[in-house]
UniProtKB/Swiss-Prot annotation:
Organism: Lactobacillus johnsonii (strain CNCM I-12250 / La1 / NCC 533)
Protein name: Peptidyl-tRNA hydrolase
Keyword Oxidoreductase: no
Organism lineage string: Bacteria, Bacillati, Bacillota, Bacilli, Lactobacillales
Function: Hydrolyzes ribosome-free peptidyl-tRNAs (with 1 or more amino acids incorporated), which drop off the ribosome during protein synthesis, or as a result of ribosome stalling. Catalyzes the release of premature peptidyl moieties from peptidyl-tRNA molecules trapped in stalled 50S ribosomal subunits, and thus maintains levels of free tRNAs and 50S ribosomes.
Cellular component, GO annotation: cytoplasm
Reactions catalysed: an N-acyl-L-alpha-aminoacyl-tRNA + H2O = an N-acyl-L-amino acid + a tRNA + H(+)
Subcellular location: Cytoplasm
Pfam families, per database record: Pept_tRNA_hydro
Major subcellular location class: cytoplasm
Amino acid sequence: MKLITGLGNPGRKYDQTKHNTGFMALDHYLEKNGLTLDKNKFEGLWTKQKINGEDVIFLEPQTFMNDSGKSIAQVANFFKIKPEDILVIHDDMDMPIGKIRIRANGKSGGHNGIKSIMACLGTNNFNRLKIGIRHPENESVVSWVLSPFNNDQQKLMDAAFETSENVINDFIKGKNAQYLMNQYN
């Protein structure tokens, strides 16, 4: 069984903001594949599907970003999902807008959602699909991550979401982190 989760903040106020890149990437995948998050439990919106013979749970935690780990840990514990079978999709300010990077483990990189997941799972041994949003140039970090993408930036993000769909499909097919890193980094 696989768990694929996008990180973001709940509510319309944050809907299309840079910090909700994880939600947007997951929403793109779900929409392209005719899926919806039809359950509300474990402090998140989720669905369980069978894809290519694999049980897959898609999750968007409805805690705020900094508490994302609570929802993810509840799902992982309930369904007995191993950390290496989890893929977390999130924004990354240390990468250019629209750049994708896969990681199998590692530090949080200062991302509070990732810190929360590490604390709640008790490990950093879970897969990440990081999508770049870059550092702000002339505004605060908070203003930057809570603002939407402009048109040029959105084009780069749309391409990243297309690539993320391929990453998700390969992850579901059982491709390991090394394969994903070689293919997409």
